[in-house]
Amino acid sequence: MIGVIDYGMGNLYSVSKALERVGVPYFVSEKPEELKEADAFILPGVGSFGDAMDNLGYTKLDQLIHDMVSEGRLLLGICLGMQLLFEESEENGTASGLGLLKGKAVRLKAEDEKGNKLKVPHMGWNRLSFHNESPLLTKTEQGYAYFVHSYYIDGMEENALLASADYGVRVPAVVGKRNVFGAQFHPEKSSTVGMSILTQFTKMAAEQKVKK
């Protein structure tokens, strides 16, 4: 069973519909005591990094996330939810993140190295390039994914980079280390690529449950 974490800033409808399409049992909750029953978790997110962390702290969901990850349960952050997995963000000053992965969310530049203008936010389809192997991407081909974001992760560990996209800079698109994973793009809006990642995540959670 997948627990979708509701902290007031996630695109819950789209994520829920995507999980239904791949036939995955799930529930949505803002209550730590209910979410503790999940086998794995999805942390969606849209909006401001600082506001998101404030909401997670106020609801004590930040502590739940740390506790569940420490127990070895799988976590998948989506869009802003992926950025929250890292140490901090420079959005509206500096805000601390969950610190589960090393790196910082910084603003996308409005031009590439050649001086060509780029629109920020980065919005639309972009091709993925794969880096390190992971069971999360076992069944996923290097296709296109749908992005909507103004910040990207910089300074992350290379061995945690699973896939990237190019938008004037290398944008970490899929990350993963141990039982913590993230997708900067929206899997629920990314057709075959997105559905494959969600399917693999749920398979990994099911396999982990069997091992226990």
Swiss-Prot record:
GO terms for cellular component: cytoplasm. Gene3D superfamilies: 3.40.50.880. CDD domains: GATase1_IGP_Synthase. It catalyses: 5-[(5-phospho-1-deoxy-D-ribulos-1-ylimino)methylamino]-1-(5-phospho-beta-D-ribosyl)imidazole-4-carboxamide + L-glutamine = D-erythro-1-(imidazol-4-yl)glycerol 3-phosphate + 5-amino-1-(5-phospho-beta-D-ribosyl)imidazole-4-carboxamide + L-glutamate + H(+); L-glutamine + H2O = L-glutamate + NH4(+). NCBIfam families: IMP_synth_hisH (TIGR01855). Its main location: cytoplasm. It comes from Bacillus subtilis (strain 168). Residues 1-211 form the Glutamine amidotransferase type-1 domain. One of its GO terms (biological process) is L-histidine biosynthetic process. It holds the Pfam family GATase. Keywords: Amino-acid biosynthesis, Cytoplasm, Glutamine amidotransferase, Histidine biosynthesis, Hydrolase, Lyase. It is found in: Cytoplasm. Its EC number is 4.3.2.10, 3.5.1.2. This is Imidazole glycerol phosphate synthase subunit HisH. IGPS catalyzes the conversion of PRFAR and glutamine to IGP, AICAR and glutamate. The HisH subunit catalyzes the hydrolysis of glutamine to glutamate and ammonia as part of the synthesis of IGP and AICAR. The resulting ammonia molecule is channeled to the active site of HisF. Pathway: Amino-acid biosynthesis; L-histidine biosynthesis; L-histidine from 5-phospho-alpha-D-ribose 1-diphosphate: step 5/9. GO terms for molecular function: glutaminase activity; imidazoleglycerol-phosphate synthase activity; lyase activity. Heterodimer of HisH and HisF. The gene is hisH.
